[in-house]
A protein has these predicted regions:
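C-terminal active-site-proximal or functional interface alpha/beta core segments in diverse enzymes
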Residues: 90, 99-248
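Active-site-proximal beta-alpha core segment in soluble small-molecule metabolic enzymes
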Residues: 1-130, 139, 155-158
Length: 248
């Protein structure tokens, strides 16, 4: 209740706050707090996709996700909001496909499914306007650009192009205005700037080299080497002749 009240107070202050339903039971609590505080909320729903994904963390999203509403639960939310005269409060559809999705085809399938659900909500009378794609944008750790767990067969530009194209095709076919698109691609943002922090276990120290002086009776070979050393300290040689020195 405190978290919901905080969000509603922020909305009263003029901030744009969207309360996203991740479980069916959350709707009654939100409506109760809204009625007590006299606030019409801005709502979103997290939808549980049926499209299959791939990758090491594929179990955290899609139809097997612990969070999100299936299609029947989503329609019950729509019916409840319609009965309360608050269907216009539903503004956003959100889903989370998983993390590190290596295949662009799986991402496109998920976007297409979610957009069709979005279009269906608009046809039911929901105001909508926002589509949150969640995470999934992969990082090619091995640089091989393959559809494996540690890689991806697409880049950021291809991801953006496929997402926008898929959304545009479905919405245009249904005659629905294009939504504002939100992504939560945290991995793709921070992975390139990772820092390894460890405790210092030990320190090796080295004494500086003792300054050596050229002795007066030094052999000619040593003198030649000394002169080369001194010349190299003055800077790069100007000609090829100055770069060569034959020592006997």
């Amino acid at each position: 209740e405190e978290f919901i009240d905080l969000a509603l107070h922020a909305q009263k202050m003029g901030l744009q706050v969207i309360l996203v339903l991740e479980m069916p039971s959350e709707l009654d609590l939100i409506l109760e707090r809204c009625k007590k505080m006299g606030v019409r909320p801005t709502l979103g729903v997290r939808f549980r996709l049926s499209a299959e994904s791939a990758g090491h963390w594929s179990g955290s999203g899609g139809d097997s996700s612990m969070f999100g509403l299936n299609i029947s639960q989503l329609m019950r939310v729509v019916d409840t909001l319609r009965e309360k005269g608050m269907l216009d409060c539903l503004r956003m559809l959100h889903y989370h496909q998983g993390s590190q999705i290596p295949n662009i085809r799986a991402i496109r399938q998920a976007v297409t499914e979610a957009t069709r659900v979005y279009v269906g909500l608009v046809s039911e009378g929901a105001r909508m306007g926002i589509l949150d794609l969640g995470g999934g944008l992969a990082v090619s750790y091995d640089g091989l650009k393959g559809a494996t767990e540690g890689s991806s067969n697409y880049g950021t530009k291809e991801y953006c192009a496929d997402v926008i194209e898929a959304i545009g095709e479905v919405t245009a076919e249904a005659g629905v205005p294009h939504p504002d698109i939100i992504t939560e691609s945290g991995r793709a943002i921070v992975a390139y700037y990772s820092v390894l922090v460890i405790n210092v276990l030990d320190v090796n120290r080295f004494e500086p080299h003792r300054q050596v002086a050229l002795e007066k009776d030094a052999p000619s070979l040593v003198r030649n080497l000394w002169e080369l050393r001194e010349e190299s300290r003055k800077g790069p040689a100007k000609t090829n002749h100055e770069r060569l020195q034959e020592i006997y």
